[in-house]
């Protein structure tokens, strides 16, 4: 007998002793689930009742007012007083381009 078979026999004896001492743990390899169990505290709504009931539009109207007020605030922010408004031709350049010391007006 070589050392490997002797080791296997010793380990088999140890495993048999452990299985005899712990019969409930033999073959159990799964971990217990630690996730919380979710429960519904309220009574679930019936889909038929919710389909037949009209939709409450007051919340939607309030949301629409909120969006409009935000839009007006953004427009006021974009129309600053210190910026000049574009004329009839739109935004035109009034700068000059410098190449080799010459000043050439931008078109």
UniProtKB/Swiss-Prot annotation:
Pfam families: N36 (PF11438)
One GO molecular-function entry: RNA binding
GO BP annotations listed: DNA-templated transcription termination; regulation of DNA-templated transcription elongation; regulation of transcription by RNA polymerase II; transcription antitermination
tRNA processing in keyword set: no
Keywords: DNA-binding, Transcription, Transcription regulation, Transcription termination
InterPro entries (UniProt xref): Antiterm_prot_N_Arg-rich
Subunit (UniProt): Interacts with host nusA.
Function summary: Plays a role as a transcriptional antitermination factor that allows the virus to initiate its lytic phase. Activates expression of the delayed viral early genes by modifying host RNA polymerase (RNAP) into a form that is resistant to termination signals. This antitermination function requires the host NusA protein which serves to stabilize the interaction between antitermination protein N and host RNA polymerase.
Protein name in the entry: Antitermination protein N
Organism listed in the record: Escherichia phage lambda
Gene it is expressed from: N
């Amino acid at each position: 007998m070589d050392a490997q078979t002797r080791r296997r026999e010793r380990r088999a004896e140890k495993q048999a002793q452990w299985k005899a001492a712990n019969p409930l743990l033999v073959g159990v390899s799964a971990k217990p689930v630690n996730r919380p169990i979710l429960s519904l505290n309220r009574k679930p709504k019936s889909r038929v009742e919710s389909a037949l009931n009209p939709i409450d539009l007051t919340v939607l109207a309030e949301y629409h007012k909120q969006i409009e007020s935000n839009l007006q605030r953004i427009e006021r922010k974009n129309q600053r007083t210190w910026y000049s408004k574009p004329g009839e031709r739109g935004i035109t350049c009034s700068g000059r381009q410098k190449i080799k010391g010459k000043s050439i007006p931008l078109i």
